[in-house]
């Protein structure tokens, strides 16, 4: 008898700009989302993300950003990138739930947030949901 199938997440082909300062987390996310078919622009901080966005001529479909990082936080980076790329969808992630900036993000229903630590399947599903949703997500 065959094992029951797990719910699968749709494969993607979109481009995702990832901003994550922790190398082990960044590597896991790149590996996971690449396996799901996404093109990943990998950065470790806000300044690098802004530079990468400016140099990238193609469409960036999603900004997947940590919130608490050295230098600019993910919220500030998202605000700047949304000004440059109004169609950009954003998914914030953090494990620092008591942070004031995380609380600010959570207070706006337009923002989409994923709490760390997360299961790989939860990340893949949330990315797909945001990409299939409206630009204000």
Where do the model's predicted regions map?
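Disordered, acidic interdomain junction associated with two-component signaling
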Residues: 1-17, 104
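Conserved acidic carboxylate
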Residues: 20
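The feature encodes the CheY-like receiver
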Residues: 26, 70-71, 98
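Charged docking surfaces used in two-component/phosphorelay signaling
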Residues: 27-35
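Short hydrophobic/Thr-rich beta-strand motif most characteristic of the beta2 strand and flanking loop
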Residues: 37-44, 52, 114
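Acidic catalytic/metal-coordinating carboxylates
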Residues: 45-48, 70-77
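Active-site beta3 strand of CheY-like receiver
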Residues: 57-64
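Active-site residues of response regulator receiver
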Residues: 66, 94
């Amino acid at each position: 008898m065959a094992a029951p199938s797990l719910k699968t997440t749709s494969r993607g082909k979109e481009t995702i700009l990832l901003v994550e300062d922790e190398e082990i987390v960044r590597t896991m996310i790149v590996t996971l989302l690449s396996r799901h078919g996404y093109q990943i622009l990998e950065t470790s901080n806000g300044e690098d993300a802004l530079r990468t966005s400016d140099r990238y001529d193609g469409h960036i479909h999603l900004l997947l950003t940590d919130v608490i990082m050295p230098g600019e936080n993910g919220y500030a980076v998202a605000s700047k990138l949304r000004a440059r790329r109004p169609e950009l969808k954003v998914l914030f992630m953090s494990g620092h739930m008591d942070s004031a900036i995380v609380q600010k993000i959570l207070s706006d229903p337009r923002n989409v947030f994923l709490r760390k630590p997360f299961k790989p399947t939860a990340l893949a599903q949330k990315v797909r949901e945001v990409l299939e949703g409206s630009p204000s997500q």
